[in-house]
Regions:
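Acidic, Ser/Thr/Pro
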Residues: 1-242
Length: 242
């Protein structure tokens, strides 16, 4: 078991084209494992006590001087607080710049979706998946933000064009998030918007939830960047009296 995990309390598996949401408490971990290879997990984060506070991709990248997400990086809100830290990572690169797939992306690449014909194997897109989950909390399209795409790597050509790296995630690769404040998590397993596979992906992702070990003073994420130390200070101030 990981040094960051105290106990595993819940496990589930999601196939491609699925979506899910839940409130995750501070001190909880979420480990996501790509069971089949080349998974994509789109994620958004909100403060359940103030839904106006949400994940901010530009600030997350800017304050940590990076274009990618990996071990040591923290996922910031637009209030300068840390939703979660990436405490373990098998891949070394996760995307948070390319955005989300939409119905037109899916149709152009793999044809129209048809629930009547395909049933639960229909070709769902990330945008509509997020809208379904947002609606459960009184939110809508206006509340969407730039999302994380776990397990996906972006390559940039000399001309500045973005492309999805092929065969980036292998079966069994995982990433471990430790939540530093109560967080409303929205996620989907729909294809990355730059996915050019011949067929709609049919992979599977395992998600484990449980109690994380307490944060030590020499915590890797806390000390990864000076900015992260200040982010943890913002969280400490926010949690006074709780």
């Amino acid at each position: 078991m990981s040094d960051y995990i105290k106990s595993i309390e819940y496990t589930t598996k999601l196939t491609s084209g699925s979506h899910w949401s839940l409130r995750v408490r501070r001190g909880t971990f979420m480990r996501l494992t790509d069971l089949t290879g080349d998974a994509n997990v789109g994620m958004l984060f909100y403060n359940p006590e103030d839904l106006l506070e949400r994940y901010n991709a530009p600030d997350t990248l800017k304050c940590q001087h990076t274009f990618k997400l990996t071990k040591g990086n923290c996922l910031y809100s637009d209030m300068g607080r840390i939703f979660a830290s990436i405490v373990e990572d098998d891949l070394g690169w996760h995307d948070t710049v390319a955005g989300n797939s939409r119905a037109e992306h899916i149709e152009a690449q793999w044809g129209k979706r048809d629930y009547q014909a395909d049933r639960n194997a229909w070709k769902q897109n990330g945008h509509d998946s997020f809208l379904v989950e947002l609606g459960k909390y009184g939110l809508n399209a206006a509340d969407l933000a730039a999302n994380v795409n776990l397990f996906s790597k972006i390559e940039i050509s000399n001309e500045g064009d973005m492309a999805l790296a092929e065969n980036h995630s292998k079966p069994g690769n995982s990433v471990l998030l430790r939540f530093e404040m109560d967080t409303l998590v929205l996620l989907h397993t729909c294809p990355h918007p730059l996915d050019k596979s011949a067929h709609y992906p049919r992979g599977k992702v395992k998600i484990e939830l449980g109690v994380a070990q307490p944060i030590a003073e020499d915590d890797y994420c806390k000390n990864f960047r000076p900015e992260n130390g200040r982010g943890f200070e913002n969280n400490a101030l926010y949690h006074i009296g709780l």
